[in-house]
Amino acid sequence: MNVTVTVYDKNVKYRLEENIKNNKGPSNDDQPAYNNESKSTDGSDYAMFPTNIKYIFEDNNDELVDSSDAALTAGIDKVGDELENVIIVQLDESGSLEDITLISDQYELLSHRTNSLSLEENQMRTLSSHGDDKSNDEEEELSVDSDRFRVDSDIELDVISQFCDLSPFLRDLSLNDLIKLYVTQNEQLQMLSNSV
């Protein structure tokens, strides 16, 4: 099973920084600029790809889970490493997302999305990629093993980083743009308070 995790920081400061870097204010054509529903395609998100994965474990219900400090920090060098942000992804046996948790002092989880290929789509993709290797004259059948027919999941997290002073970015914004900005921040705060 392949799991890809992408984290999008929805903090409005990134959109404001982009506007200043491009030496332009938000235009009327740029409607989703401060919209909470905007995706990375409009450039309003700061995308991060977690790569410092220390350990992955499977919880087997038949075994006693070791919850000691040594087990929970396996693979972490006490002197050189310090965990800053932890994303816990719980998948069931079929690879479907059961739960996701973000433990962080710098970020709060707003929402998450999954985009999983079904088993049939994975099988078709695998068969078509291996189809060139087999000739039609051979009567061999492709065996179904767990390595070749796995479920691939893309998990996207929308997070919000700590609010910061935006006053240097706000000087050239119109009243309409300021209203959109504060509406977006209020929606984000409402999502956070609803999750508590």
Curated annotation (Swiss-Prot):
Its main location: cytoplasm. The modification Phosphoserine is found at residues 38, 40, 44, 116, 135, 143, 146, 153, 174, 195. Residues 135-144 have a biased composition (Acidic residues). Highly phosphorylated. Ser-174 is phosphorylated constitutively. Phosphorylation at Ser-174 is required for autophagy induced by various autophagy stimuli such as nitrogen starvation and rapamycin treatment. Keywords: Autophagy, Chromosome partition, Cytoplasm, Cytoskeleton, Karyogamy, Microtubule, Phosphoprotein, Protein transport, Transport. The modification Phosphothreonine is found at residue 41. Changing residue 174 to A: Decreases the percentage of cells having vacuolar ATG8, impairs ATG9 recycling between the PAS and the cytoplasmic pool, and reduces autophagy by about 60%. InterPro entries: Atg31. Plays a role in starvation-induced autophagy. Involved in mitophagy. Functions with ATG17 and ATG29 at the preautophagosomal structure (PAS) in order to form normal autophagosomes under starvation conditions. May be involved in microtubule function, such as chromosome segregation and karyogamy. Forms a stable complex with ATG17 and ATG29. Interacts directly with ATG29. The ATG17-ATG29-ATG31 complex interacts with the ATG1-ATG13 complex. Note=The interaction with the ATG1-ATG13 complex is induced by starvation. Present with 486 molecules/cell in log phase SD medium. This is Autophagy-related protein 31. It comes from Saccharomyces cerevisiae (strain ATCC 204508 / S288c) (Baker's yeast). The lineage of its organism: Eukaryota, Fungi, Dikarya, Ascomycota, Saccharomycotina.
